[in-house]
Amino acid sequence: SITGNKSSVAGDYALSATSKTVAATITQKSLTESGLSVAASRAYDGTTAASVSGTAALLASETAGSGTTSDGKPYTGDTVSITGTAVGTYNDAHVANATTVTFSGLSLTGAQAGNYSLTIQSPASATITAATLTPTITNTGVTKVYDGTTSSSITPTYSFTGLVSGDTAATLTNTGIAYNYKDVATATLVTVSGLSISSITGNKSSVAGDYALSATSKTVAAT
């Protein structure tokens, strides 16, 4: 039809062409990946690395024209699959703040891969638990003159096993230091009790809560 004030009709005109074009694009359909998992927790190691299990996979394909453009499924007949090595990364390296692991390292491959983009599965819930720290009292030649009590005035020094790479030492506090007996004949050791971690030294920014002591009291030979 023709619009105007001349009462024109379609037959009064002839088109210059029976087809015309306009610029347009087709955007990629997003495919959903699933199948990866991580352990519910792991011990502190000073990094955000998480060990990934499972196999990344796409949803089952569907016939072109069916489903929706947002259903995450490839179309039957298209050659597209997942390639790469899945990497898991904690949101934080430290015990107090680590709550989730995100996945990365995957992409699409195949003749029709360019028609799609990949949506990696949602982060997994996971935590980091304290690493076990074992202190050993390194004082030698611990002794005192008999004073009728079990008190000891030593300042404990320690060596440690269980520090993660990059951490070099820990500062410990205690609530008591005492001989096992007060008498010369029976006194054989000093016990440092009520041990707790005050701070960690190293280049990992580790804090006391990233470690748990293997025991809250330690002994050293003494006379």
Question: Which residue ranges define each predicted feature?
Answer:
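Short loop/turn motifs that initiate or flank beta-strands
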Residues: 1-223
